[in-house]
């Protein structure tokens, strides 16, 4: 899955979760509210994971470039 798709998926989970949470609050359905909070938190976790993956990819690519430059010299 591409970085953009991962970010989109995480935002979708956050938004859907928030909607379920609000629905649960309005209707008094505590289970639905909890389900929404959980989904929203999962979306936030996915977002942080996608950020970490991007950072690691950047560091690895930078290290590869440095190694390639050294081998070219």
Swiss-Prot record:
Biased composition (Basic and acidic residues): 1-35, 44-73
Region span, Disordered: 1-73
Signal peptide span: none
Pfam families documented for this protein: CsbD
Superkingdom of origin: Bacteria
InterPro entries, sorted: CsbD, YjbJ_sf
Residue ranges of coiled coil: none
Family, as annotated: Belongs to the UPF0337 (CsbD) family.
Name of the protein: UPF0337 protein lp_1708
Organism of derivation: Lactiplantibacillus plantarum (strain ATCC BAA-793 / NCIMB 8826 / WCFS1) (Lactobacillus plantarum)
